[in-house]
Amino acid sequence: MPLVNYTEDPLHVLHPKDGAAGTDRPKALLDAVEEDPDPLLKLAAAHVVSSQQFSRDELLQLFRLAAQYETTPALMHLPLAGKILISAFYEPSTRTRLSFESAWHRLGGAVMSITDPKSTGIAKGESLADIAEMFNNYGDVLVLRSSDGEAAHNMLENLRIPLVNAGNGIDEHPTQALADVYTLAKWRPELFTGQVAPESRIKVGIIGVPSRMRTVRSLLRMLSLFPDAIDEVVIISREDENFDPGQREELEEAGLSLRLVHELDPLLPELDVVYINAIAWVGDTFEAMGEGLKLDRDSPLKKDAVILHPLARGDELSTDLDDSPHNWYFAQARGAVFVRMALLTTVVRRISAVMDTPEN
């Protein structure tokens, strides 16, 4: 490995590989979306379990606040000081857990972290209802990840603090969808503000299985709030059964145009956005899906297409794309911190500390 002269280039290690860094794009998003605190006030003290529960206006204001955090470090004047986040991850995680904990720390709060269910009362057979009662006494927000698709729902009845679902089995991952769509909103803000001409709408390709992958399920539901921005969503999958009963109908009734194909490369020249995932969590392990559906530097991508990936990746996404302009997946991971900061600020009723317009 060649040596780097840090005297000549002291910020060398801070140079991101992708081309989506900097503040120009979040600033453009700020310019495109007028501040309105009212939609966010509706989320105060709310549980966040599904991407289905958000409105279009709520998303736009969350994205605007995230862009403020991303462009204005001075805005982070510790609005969550004195607040405690319970970070309960009963399923393996690196990015999501650290992203939430980073978001909370940046806002001045303290974190209590659980990363091994064997170290909790669950290992002794304690019920989720009793655990929820204990969480009420220890923290101000619970971020929960579990391989049990019903865990988040089962805790709600006994929780008096907001719960944020960080992934529940194969069901949903709503804050990953927030990070995904926030990335697209920075890429092309006009798509999400109703200012896009029909001929400028985008075609999105999603490599994954909507019925088995929580990231894909949540993303599709969130995209369905912006059908006027999307010409078509193409699901690329080798599976025979890709949708749960009623899932496709729900999305099409919301206005999304859906198509299913089995081969990737013939479609790539048409796609403006390529979203790729190959992991579906099942129980305490995962299934690798989509064998043969891979992206690398030789893939026939559209010149200005962007690639998104929720990470962690395997060989479905080659590292030789990391230095290409198609790489928006690192920006996606960076932006996840800011959009989670926006969401957490909202659910703990601290909007008045960071928005120009005070709460009512």
Spell out what each predicted region is.
Residues 2-98, 358:
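Positively charged, low-complexity intrinsically disordered leader regions
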Residues 51-79, 170-199:
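Short N-terminal or domain-adjacent regulatory/targeting segments
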Residues 78-185, 314-319:
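Phosphate/diphosphate ligand-binding glycine-rich loop within oxidoreductases
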Residues 161, 228-231, 299-306:
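A short helix->loop->beta-strand "cap" motif at the edges of active sites that frequently abuts
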Residues 251-327:
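Rossmann-like adenosine-cofactor binding region
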Residues 304-305, 310-360:
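Adenosine-phosphate binding glycine-rich loop
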